[in-house]
Design a protein with these regions (language model features):
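Polar/charged alpha-helical tracts
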Residues: 79-82, 216, 253, 385-390, ...
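Peripheral, non-catalytic segments that deliver or gate enzyme domains
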Residues: 1-237, 242-250, 263-280, 321-324
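Cap/lid segment of the alpha/beta-hydrolase catalytic domain
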Residues: 214-331, 338-339, 366, 371-377
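Hydrophobic/aromatic beta-strand patches that form the interior of the parallel beta-sheet core
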Residues: 19, 136, 226, 256, ...
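Active-site-proximal cap/loop segments of hydrolase catalytic domains
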Residues: 287-477
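Glycine-rich His-Gly loop
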Residues: 140, 187, 257-261, 339-342, ...
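A general structural-boundary detector
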Residues: 5, 122, 148, 182, ...
Length: 477
């Protein structure tokens, strides 16, 4: 298709090509329109679905067992954009492969998306029989992993494994054709995970591998989901972690730890940074501020042009929620984050220093006025989406907003000690931004420590570098 990049193909269960997905790479909708085409009997193709960024979308996932219906995720929306059934969070639908008629809404969760609306085809975690055809069930991410079963036998196996590993998440990864052997993983907030083989014929579960067996030697903290309300009335979600030795009624130091992205979200599970902080006596708050994925279309749209503003307030409102529960020593609160989380930490340092005792900004973004907003990660194709969400620096009003919410230009406001960290080989944000931020802190004689690793990029990967990173955290705190 001229001007469009093919991003996926769809076959029926007999291997016959049905259609394909494209992403617009030229024209007025460049970078913001996804389209699905169906092959026609005369060897051509016709447009049957079209989706603009942040609009109501529907994405095919698979043919159903009858090889006539298509299972898909999203909103019930026609090719012209008309919404038949507004569900906000995306739902699992069955549609007629010939007419495109929406036949049934199979499952919907009013609080959580079944898959990220940004990821298109094949984004759901669905369990099919070994030859395809039959859908046993699927999982999606709520406060913890949620599972929906359509096959009683598959459900009984999964629930039996869950009973063996209480307080863990069990994920079946693969299985034999006769459904007698299952490869699965087990993990939790205190366990990074292990792989097992379940042989039903022998009634035996055998460990295959383990991520970090030494973790069991340490007392780690429980990570608990919570919900809170933003100051403008939006229901938001997060996770709170209290130290393993926490005593009820005690007010303790806290670290606010926003995730990166911002088009991402936190999940229940093992988080090395969170456990590091908690085992040093800090409470930790992770929050899915507006703009986080997985909570519906409306919440995503509410984040447009709100970097450093309402998105930032959502982080502080999570802190206030924890304070209302009686957990927080408000005189000893720090904020720590990486990538967009590093931006949020530095924004806090320049706009609301009175709330915090210290700042940890790791591989962060500090200048929103740059034409590419994000540096080397995004090609020209990715910019239109960024401009919708954050603003276009070429637009005078947008530029003003981006400038006013760029920490780089407000270093003189900093009052808290800052640990600022970067990798020289970062390909997702500009290394020069960190250099510029450090120069501004130096110009205003601020209290900061600057760490740069020449062989690391957007997040440290080598074991020695990560060990040194945590040592730097501990020394700084």
């Amino acid at each position: 298709v001229p001007g469009e990049l093919v991003t996926g193909w769809m076959l029926d269960w007999e291997g016959v090509p049905y259609g394909f997905e494209t992403f617009m790479e030229e024209g007025p909708n460049k970078g913001i329109e996804t389209t699905f085409y169906k092959f026609t009997d005369n060897g051509g193709y016709e447009k049957v679905l079209s989706c603009m960024h942040q609009a109501a979308c529907f994405f095919p996932q698979s043919f159903d067992i009858d090889n006539k219906s298509i299972l898909g995720v999203g909103q019930a929306v026609l090719p012209n954009g008309q919404i038949i059934n507004e569900t906000d969070t995306n739902a699992l639908w069955s549609i007629n492969s010939e007419t495109g008629e929406y036949q049934e809404m199979i499952y919907h969760d009013p609080d959580y998306d079944l898959s990220s609306p940004m990821h298109g085809m094949y984004s759901m975690n669905m369990w099919f029989s070994s030859g395809g055809y039959e859908l046993y069930g699927f999982s999606y991410e709520g406060a913890k992993t949620e599972k929906v079963y359509f096959d009683e036998y598959f459900a009984s196996v999964d629930k039996s494994l869950e009973a063996i590993f209480p307080d863990h998440e069990v994920r079946i990864r693969d299985w034999s054709d006769d459904l007698t052997r299952f490869l699965f993983t087990v993990s939790s907030d205190k366990d990074p995970g292990a792989s097992y083989l379940f042989d039903l014929s022998k009634g035996k579960v055998s460990k295959v591998s383990e991520s970090a067996p030494w973790i069991k030697n340490y007392q780690l903290a429980d990570i608990e989901p919570f919900t809170y309300t933003s100051r403008d009335g939006i229901k938001l979600h997060g996770y709170i972690t209290l130290p393993p030795n926490y005593k009820e009624g005690e007010k303790i130091p806290f670290i606010i730890h926003p995730h990166g992205g911002p088009n991402a979200r936190d999940y229940w599970g093992y988080n090395p940074e969170v456990q590091f902080y908690a085992t040093r006596g800090y409470g930790v708050i992770q929050m899915d501020y507006r703009g986080s994925t997985g909570y519906g279309r409306k919440e995503m749209i509410l984040a447009n042009h709100q970097m450093g503003k309402k998105m930032q307030e959502d982080k502080y409102d999570a802190l206030m929620w924890a304070n209302d529960q009686g957990y927080v020593d408000m005189d000893n609160v720090c904020i720590s984050g990486a990538s967009y989380g590093g931006y949020a930490a530095m924004q806090a340092a320049t706009k609301n220093p009175e709330l915090f005792k210290c700042i940890i900004a790791y591989v962060g973004v500090y200048d929103l006025t740059s034409m590419d907003l994000r540096g080397l990660q995004w090609s020209d194709l990715g910019m239109p989406m960024e401009y919708i969400e954050k603003g276009d620096p070429k637009d005078p009003d947008d530029y003003k907003n981006l400038y006013e919410n760029s920490p780089l230009f407000f270093a003189e406001n900093v009052e808290d000690p800052i640990l600022i960290i970067t990798g020289r080989r970062d390909t997702q944000v500009r290394f020069q931004e960190t250099v510029d931020m450090v120069n501004e802190l130096k110009k205003y004689n601020k209290d900061y420590k600057y760490i740069i690793k020449g062989e690391e990029g957007h997040g440290f990967r080598r074991e020695t570098a990560r060990l040194e990173l945590f040592q730097d955290y501990e020394e700084f705190l």
